[in-house]
């Protein structure tokens, strides 16, 4: 299910068309929002965008992994990872879109 990748430029263009800011102001706005999200995540804060998703940093403890080639046990050091959790609103929107596409692809049943 490959699709188009939405870039910062695409977001800025959308802001330009829908909000009416200049292209430069739109690009600056997109950059500012992304910077604020990144800065909050780096500070260890949870970023919750209602009806979209939650971003947060989670600590992972040290654990033992296994080299798939040799089967040798390898220690995996503790680290922090960023998680993205889609909201239920976004999940439902994705599901509805998927079901609508699936319904369009279904061939019509001929009358018997």
UniProtKB/Swiss-Prot annotation:
<keyword id="KW-0810">Translation regulation</keyword>
<keyword id="KW-0804">Transcription</keyword>
<dbReference type="InterPro" id="IPR010992">
    <property type="entry name" value="IHF-like_DNA-bd_dom_sf"/>
</dbReference>
<dbReference type="InterPro" id="IPR020816">
    <property type="entry name" value="Histone-like_DNA-bd_CS"/>
</dbReference>
<dbReference type="GO" id="GO:0009893">
    <property type="term" value="P:positive regulation of metabolic process"/>
</dbReference>
<dbReference type="GO" id="GO:0030527">
    <property type="term" value="F:structural constituent of chromatin"/>
</dbReference>
<comment type="similarity">
    <text>Belongs to the bacterial histone-like protein family.</text>
</comment>
<keyword id="KW-0238">DNA-binding</keyword>
<keyword id="KW-0805">Transcription regulation</keyword>
<keyword id="KW-0233">DNA recombination</keyword>
<dbReference type="GO" id="GO:0005829">
    <property type="term" value="C:cytosol"/>
</dbReference>
<dbReference type="GO" id="GO:0003677">
    <property type="term" value="F:DNA binding"/>
</dbReference>
<dbReference type="Pfam" id="PF00216">
    <property type="entry name" value="Bac_DNA_binding"/>
</dbReference>
<comment type="function">
    <text>This protein is one of the two subunits of integration host factor, a specific DNA-binding protein that functions in genetic recombination as well as in transcriptional and translational control.</text>
</comment>
<protein>
    <recommendedName>
        <fullName>Integration host factor subunit alpha</fullName>
    </recommendedName>
</protein>
<dbReference type="InterPro" id="IPR000119">
    <property type="entry name" value="Hist_DNA-bd"/>
</dbReference>
<dbReference type="GO" id="GO:0006417">
    <property type="term" value="P:regulation of translation"/>
</dbReference>
<dbReference type="InterPro" id="IPR005684">
    <property type="entry name" value="IHF_alpha"/>
</dbReference>
<comment type="subunit">
    <text>Heterodimer of an alpha and a beta chain.</text>
</comment>
<dbReference type="GO" id="GO:0006310">
    <property type="term" value="P:DNA recombination"/>
</dbReference>
<dbReference type="GO" id="GO:0006355">
    <property type="term" value="P:regulation of DNA-templated transcription"/>
</dbReference>
């Amino acid at each position: 299910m490959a699709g188009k990748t939405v870039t910062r430029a695409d977001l800025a263009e959308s802001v330009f068309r829908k909000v009416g800011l200049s292209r430069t102001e739109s690009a600056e706005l997109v950059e500012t929002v992304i910077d604020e999200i990144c800065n909050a995540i780096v500070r260890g804060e949870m970023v919750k965008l209602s009806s979209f998703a939650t971003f947060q940093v989670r600590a992972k403890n040290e654990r033992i992994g296994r080299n798939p080639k040799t089967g040798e046990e390898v220690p995996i050091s503790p680290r922090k990872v960023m998680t993205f959790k889609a909201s239920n609103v976004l999940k439902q929107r994705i599901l509805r879109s998927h079901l609508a596409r699936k319904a369009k692809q279904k061939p019509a049943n001929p009358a018997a």
